[in-house]
A protein has these predicted regions:
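A charged, aromatic-enriched C-terminal amphipathic alpha-helix characteristic of glycosyltransferases
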Residues: 353-381
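Nucleotide-activated donor-binding/catalytic signature segment of Leloir-type glycosyltransferases, i.e.
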Residues: 255-273, 277
Length: 391
C-alpha cells in the first residue's frame, strides 16, 4: 500500500509532528513493503526521494522566523501531487485549509482520509479569548469552534487522537469514529545510556549540587512558557544557587526568556537542537523535565525525556496523563507560577533517579515506535476495508 502524510506543522528545526512522520517513514522502509509520500511546506518546491519514500516540499511563505514554520497555501499543488501519487490512504495532520483540501481530494480520487488531532487548539486559543471578549462573546466563540471541529473531523473516515481523555472530549462534541493512537519513542536514541551526564553538565558549567531543569519546545503562549519563566524566577528568589534552567527552543515568547536571562544568571538558552543524539544527552543530564503546557496533546518531548530516565513535572489537567509513565504526585494543582515553583521544589526532594528508571523501562516495553506503528497500521487497514465496503 501507499500512504500519504499531509501537514503544514513541519519545521526543519524539528518538532513533534516532524519526528512522528519521519519515524513512520523509517518504520515503513525497514519493516514493511509499503510506500510513503509526505507533503509539507518548504522554502522551495522540490521532491526528495529515498527508497520507497518521497517528500514533496511546496514553496510556502514563512510565518515564523524563529521556528521556521510555513503556511501551506498552494492547495492546487497539493491536489496535483495527490492526483499523481494516488495513495491508498491519506493522513492529514492539520485542522485548517490543508485538512479541507485533503478531504476534497480524497472524495474526488476515492481515497480514504483520516485526520490526526495533534493539538487541542480550541482550548489553547479560544478559551484564552474569553478574558478579553467577555463571557458571552467568549462562549459564543467556543460554540462556533466546537461546531467547526465537529464538521471538519466528521468529514474524515476516522479521527486519530493521542489520548483517550481527549478522545472523550471530541466524542462529547459530536466527533464520530475517534481512534486512540499511542505516541512512540525511539528507544535506541532516547535511552539512559551512555552515562554522559558528567560531561554534559561540565559543558554547561554546572556546580555538582545544582539541579538542572530542562524545557524543550516552542516558546509560545499555547505552550505556557511564560508561566515557566515566572516560576523559575520565583525559584531563584528563594534559592538562587539551587537550580539551573536549560531551555531548548525558540518562538514568540523569546523576549520573556531574554528578560529572565537578564535577571537570572542560572539560565541557558539554545535556540534549537536538530541532532537527536545531542538532544538525548541533555535529557539524560537533566534532573527534571518541566512541561508547563496545559493544552498539550502530542507531548513527544515528555516521552523522550522519560525514555532517557528523566522524570517529568507539569500541571494537572492536561491531556498527557497517558504518556506520563511515573506517578504524578508532585504535579502542580494550579496553573500559576507559585504552584509550579512549589511543585518543582517538592519533586526535587523525591528519588528522581528511581522515578526516571521506572519510566524508562516502561517506555521501552510499551511505547517503542515499531509497537506503536503496528497498531496504527492496523487502524489504517481497518479504515481502508470499511471505506471499500461503503463504496
Amino acid at each position: 500500500m501507499k500512504f500519504c502524510d499531509l501537514t503544514q506543522f513541519y519545521s526543519p528545526l524539528s518538532g513533534g509532528v516532524k519526528r512522528y512522520v519521519h519515524e513512520k517513514i523509517a518504520y515503513i522502509q525497514s519493516e514493511t513493503e509499503h510506500e510513503h509520500v509526505l507533503v509539507v511546506p518548504g522554502p522551495k518546491t522540490e521532491c526528495v526521494t529515498s527508497e520507497r519514500s518521497r517528500i514533496y516540499f511546496i514553496h510556502s511563505p514563512l510565518i515564523s522566523r524563529a521556528s521556521h514554520y510555513r503556511a501551506l497555501v498552494n492547495l492546487r499543488a497539493i491536489e496535483q501531487i495527490l492526483e499523481r501519487e494516488k495513495p491508498d490512504l491519506i493522513e492529514s495532520g492539520d485542522p485548517y485549509q490543508v485538512a479541507w483540501k485533503a478531504i476534497a481530494s480524497g472524495e474526488a480520487l476515492r481515497i480514504p482520509v483520516v485526520g490526526f488531532y495533534h493539538s487541542h487548539f480550541p482550548e489553547a486559543y479560544v478559551r484564552s479569548a474569553v478574558k478579553f471578549l467577555g463571557q458571552t462573546a467568549g462562549e459564543a466563540m467556543m460554540d462556533f469552534t466546537r461546531r467547526y471541529v465537529r464538521n471538519l473531523y466528521n468529514s474524515f473516515q476516522a479521527t486519530l487522537v493521542p489520548s483517550a481523555r481527549l478522545g472523550s472530549v471530541l466524542s462529547e462534541w459530536g466527533v464520530e469514529n475517534v481512534r486512540t493512537v499511542n505516541l512512540g519513542v525511539n528507544t535506541t536514541v532516547f535511552s539512559p545510556s551512555p552515562d554522559d551526564t558528567g560531561e554534559t553538565r561540565a559543558e554547561l558549567e554546572l556546580p555538582t549540587a545544582r539541579r538542572l531543569l530542562l524545557y524543550v519546545g516552542r516558546l509560545a503562549k499555547e505552550k505556557n512558557t511564560r508561566l515557566l519563566f515566572h516560576a523559575f524566577a520565583k525559584l531563584t528568589e528563594n534559592a538562587p544557587d539551587d537550580f539551573h534552567l536549560l531551555v531548548i527552543g525558540d518562538g514568540p515568547e523569546r523576549s520573556e526568556l531574554e528578560d529572565l536571562q537578564a535577571r537570572c544568571p542560572n539560565v541557558t538558552w539554545m535556540r534549537y537542537c536538530t541532532d537527536s543524539s545531542d538532544l538525548a544527552r541533555y535529557y539524560r543530564a537533566a534532573d527534571l523535565f518541566v512541561h508547563p503546557g496545559t493544552q498539550e496533546t502530542f507531548g513527544l518531548v515528555a516521552l523522550e525525556s522519560q525514555a532517557c530516565g528523566t522524570p517529568v513535572v507539569g500541571i494537572r489537567g492536561s491531556y498527557m496523563d497517558r504518556i506520563i509513565l511515573h506517578d504524578q504526585e508532585s504535579w502542580a494543582e494550579e496553573d500559576t507560577p507559585e504552584s509550579l515553583a512549589r511543585t518543582i521544589e517538592t519533586a526535587c526532594s523525591r528519588n528522581l533517579p528511581r522515578l526516571g528508571a521506572r519510566a524508562s523501562r516502561l517506555a521501552g516495553e510499551r511505547l517503542s515506535w515499531p509497537r506503536v506503528f503496528e497498531c496504527l497500521f492496523a487502524i489504517y487497514q481497518d479504515v481502508s476495508l470499511n471505506y471499500k465496503k461503503q463504496r
